[in-house]
Amino acid sequence: MRAARTFFRRIAAALLLAAFTGCMKWDYGPTEEFAAPDGGLFILNEGNFQYGNASLSYYHPATRQAENELFRRANGFKLGDVAQSMTIRSGVGWVVVNNSHVIFAIDLRTFRETGRITDLTSPRYIHFLSDEKAYVTQLWDNRIFIVNPKRYEITGCIECPRMTMESGSTEQMVQHGKYLFVSCWSYQNRILKIDTETDTVVDELVVGAQPASLVMDKYGKMWTVTDGGYE
């Protein structure tokens, strides 16, 4: 019975995703100029699912002041639907917008878009292996996408074993040497081990239901938090 409920939930979610894929329109408006001071904190506001009201804020501890809706104000259009995560690398912010199927690259001082990676299924997190190679985890997909951040394009994918498009879910990533570990979250219970030189899954670890957070401590030990799933 539980398997049947899970199946129908995933079918409904897949239909919703199909209905909204390609329907996101960017409504452009006026822009503002910014020059953010160093030492601030970026705050990603997820927003409500299917409302397209995700936003980006910047808080400066020295002045105790915050600026809100910075992406929209700097670029003239909204960030999108469900801002999932943000990664900073080499002075560039990479904002993963899950239900808009896009990753924006932004200047950290002006908040202006410098590029975007599109045609993603339902991106969750991005992990950089080099300036020209990164992995992107996904929901509702049995693949981890390989992207070239310099060219803002998808260059390949990693097939995850025993996952279908409907049951696919990869989440957070940590790296130890040449190996990358990926938690498999929604309705999953595994952590995958990927050889980053061959872009293949070489091993897996079964854990509790729905491992979400994943970190590596300074002693080389990996920690995960499982949320236990839901009925």
List the predicted regions and their residue ranges.
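Predominantly soluble domains enriched in secretory-pathway, periplasmic, or organellar proteins
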Residues: 23-231
